[in-house]
Amino acid sequence: MLFIFRVIFVVIYCIVVCVLGCLYCLFSPRNPKHVATFGHLFGRLSPVFGLKVELRKPADAESYGNAIYIANHQNNYDMVTASNIVQAPTVTVGKKSLLWIPFFGQLYWLTGNLLIDRNNRTKAHGTIAEVVNAFKKRKISFWMFPEGTRSRGRGLLPFKTGAFHAAIAAGVPIIPVCVSGTSNKINLNRLKNGLVIVEMLPPIETTGYGKDQIRELAARC
């Protein structure tokens, strides 16, 4: 019964947020400040899943400038856990297929996020170039999942290098975000599903790193 209630509530909540969000974003489409706003709204669903989310971040985190945030990508619950710590103006880089999710895909695009075609290496490299150019033009940060896919309980997967190439090319720091494990932890028929810690670590400077040191930088993160 609890499972059914949660599913119905979450579906209705998400549809309402996405529909009203799309209408709201039409007044300032592709504004990167929207991502944090709606990320936090989705983050409010964490208690519905029986989760208590504890945010940890450096005292000066609000004053960070342009950066690339990298986080571990576990499953769909990242949307109600990691989203709570997103800071404006930060946009995410997601797979192009997200656009086809009803309501959510349209909101994802209107809030200013970048879509990448992972099956086309040329277009993927073009997206990285777009990230670098965006840093040069305005105050903005990017959120990436360097594993490239959801780990689904397999631990931290090997990092792909796109985020690190972009950070070095743009000369911006990398800010790691760590989310404690949620895989095989959440039972939708259970009232309480425990504590999830989302921790933002201090920035890692990329100045001094060259293209031939990508793996060294990734290992440091």
Label every model-predicted segment.
Residues 103-106, 141-143, 152-216:
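A cross-family acyltransferase "interaction/gating" segment
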Residues 66-68, 139-145:
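Residue-level preference for the first positions of well-ordered beta-strands
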Residues 14-29, 33-35, 48-49, 61-121:
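Catalytic core of membrane glycerolipid acyltransferases/transacylases, capturing the structured
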Residues 73-75, 147-151:
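Short glycine-rich anion-binding loops that position phosphate/pyrophosphate groups of nucleotides
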Residues 116, 121-133:
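Anionic-ligand binding region
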Residues 1-26, 37, 59-62, 137, ...:
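Membrane-interfacial terminal anchoring regions of lipid-handling membrane enzymes
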Residues 48-56, 125-126, 180-183:
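Short gly/ser/thr-rich secondary-structure transition/capping motifs
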Residues 55, 69, 92, 198-200:
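Generic preference for hydrophobic
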